[in-house]
Each structure stands twice: as C-alpha cells, then as structure tokens.
Regions:
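A short, acidic, amphipathic alpha-helical segment used as a generic capping/interface helix at domain edges
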Residues: 232-246
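Residues at the N-termini of beta-strands
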Residues: 31, 103, 195, 251-252
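Acidic/histidine-rich catalytic cores of soluble enzymes
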Residues: 6, 31, 68, 125-234, ...
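Active-site beta-loop-alpha junctions enriched in small/polar residues
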Residues: 9-13, 35-37, 70-73, 109-111, ...
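C-terminal/domain-terminus segments
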Residues: 251-277
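Charged helix-capping and loop-helix junction motifs
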Residues: 46-52, 82-90, 117-127, 179-186, ...
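N-terminal pre-domain/capping segments
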Residues: 1-101, 135, 162, 191, ...
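Active-site acidic/histidine proton-transfer and metal-coordination neighborhood
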Residues: 16-19, 57-61, 76-167, 176
Length: 280
C-alpha cells in the first residue's frame, strides 16, 4: 500500500495555533489543516506579513498545510446570501495559496437527489462560479462528503465540467449520516478526490440530512450516529485506504477529531493506527 502522508486538523488539538503546530510535529504527522473562516486565521485578520510568519513557523517544524477549511456553516443554498459567501470563499482560496496549499474544504449544503429541486440550481450556480475561480488560480474548492450519497454528489460534480470544485472525502460522515459505503464512494468520486479526512463513526438508525445540515428548520434534530476513535467505528479503513491506493490518490489522510476528552491522545492514537495499516 502507498504510504499516504498523514495530517491533522489544527483545531482538533483545542489549543492555540502555534501550540497545535508544535504538538502536531511532536506526534509525527506531516501536514496540517486549519480553519480560516473567522478569528485570527481568517483572510481579513491574517495579513500578508502574518501569513508569511505562519508559513515559516509551520515549515520550521517540518510541516506543510494539507488544506485550509473554509466551511462558512451556511452552505450555498440561499441565492440572496450566496454572493457574499462566494466572495469570502474566494478570499479563503487566496489565503490557502499564500500558505502554499491549493485545497480549501467546505460543506456546500445538501445536494438534492432531484435535479428539479429549486436548491439544486442555486447550489450549482454558486459552485460553477467557485470552480471557475479555483481553476483560474490552480486550486480546488473541495466539497466534504456526508450530506448526500457519493452517487448524488458525483452527478452534481459531473455537470459542472470542472475540477475546480472537487471532493474532500470524509468516510465517517458517509457512514454516520447516510450509511453510504466509504469504499464505493472512493470509486464513485475517484476523479474528484483531492483531500481526505481520517475520521471514524457509527450509524445507529435513520437520519435526516436535511435536518442535520440545517436545510430545513428543526428544533429537535435527531442524530442517530456517533463519532468514534479510528478503528472503532463502521469505516473499514484497510479496505478504504486500499481503494484510495487503487485509484491513484496520493494526497493526505488528515485526522479530524471533533469529540473526546483527550484530543491530543486521540490524534496520536489515530496516527499510529493509520501507520499500522500502511506498515510504517
């Protein structure tokens, strides 16, 4: 099996940025993904000088940015709000380039399985504009998997006719929310995968993605799933990673841990688990 580089989400460490970078280097990962939507690491607050300083600090620890997270928590489902969200996303793409990565990941909302759904066209128009911009600067705006099945997402992407909008494959989201097979998703989305999350989880019953991803108003969202440490959920990581190898993916497996009382230990355990599968 290919020896995939391993990354970690800066925010998963739950400490300040520089401490997280230092800890990631100590754990022995090679890459970092960082949220850059609000706060000190947003485009408006990270000046050119600060971007240079941050990149130098990352490099001084032997690391690179695998991707930037540009999830604005709203998707691109509202025609009135989309122009502002698209412009903010373009600035995050610019920031990512300054940090020497060409991947920005995000959630775009739930892609309807029915192409005649009003939301489908709204999302497609937004993604078409983002794909053109990403193409123009040699980058990818990568949709995170989970809200819909991989087959529905593939059909949506095929219609864009561009790799500017691509895929950040999160196998746990697929397994937890829709119950989609992460291994088959690799093959369905093979032409678009530019980044992946190493996350695990289990689904315990039916879920409504429209409620979970707040596409419809809901005061009592039922989540019949749970994020789990790597190897303890329903993601078949050996088969999943073998599939990534099979399609020729050579990018990062970036550890994302959104729950748990000891995130540093969980990230370290996850890195060891992935290395064990790869025989490192």
């Amino acid at each position: 099996m290919y020896k995939f580089p391993i990354g970690a989400m800066v925010d998963s460490f739950r400490m300040d940025t520089k401490s997280a970078i230092k800890k990631a280097a100590e754990i022995g990962v090679q890459g970092l993904q960082m949220y850059s939507t609000t706060g000190e690491n947003s485009p408006e607050n990270l000046t050119v000088e600060k971007r240079r300083e941050l990149l130098d600090y990352v490099k001084s620890h032997g690391l690179v940015f695998s991707a930037i997270c540009g999830d604005l928590n709203m998707g691109f489902v509202n025609r009135e709000l989309n122009p502002e969200l698209i412009e903010k996303s373009k600035r995050i793409l610019d920031l990512a380039k300054d940090l020497e990565t060409n991947v920005v990941t995000t959630h775009i909302g739930v892609v309807p399985s029915n192409k005649n759904h009003e939301r489908y066209k709204i999302m497609q128009e937004a993604c078409f504009e983002l794909s053109r911009y990403a193409d123009s600067i040699g980058s990818h705006f990568a949709i995170e998997t989970g809200p819909e099945t991989s087959a529905v997402l593939k059909e949506f992407l095929d219609a864009l006719g561009s790799k500017g909008v691509a895929v950040n494959l999160d196998p746990a989201n697929l397994a937890m929310v829709t119950g989609d097979d992460p291994v088959q998703a690799v093959y369905n989305l093979k032409d678009y995968i530019v980044h992946t999350h190493a996350k695990d989880g289990s689904k315990f019953g039916d879920n409504n993605p429209e409620e979970i991803y707040r596409m419809v108003p809901c005061d009592n969202i039922i989540r019949n799933y749970k994020e789990m440490p790597l190897g303890e959920g329903q993601v078949p990581f050996k088969e999943y990673m073998a599939a990534l190898d099979d399609i020729g993916y050579r990018g990062f497996l970036t550890i994302e841990r959104e729950v748990g009382d000891n995130p540093v230990a969980d990230i370290e355990t996850a890195a060891k688990y992935l290395k064990g599968i790869m025989g490192i």
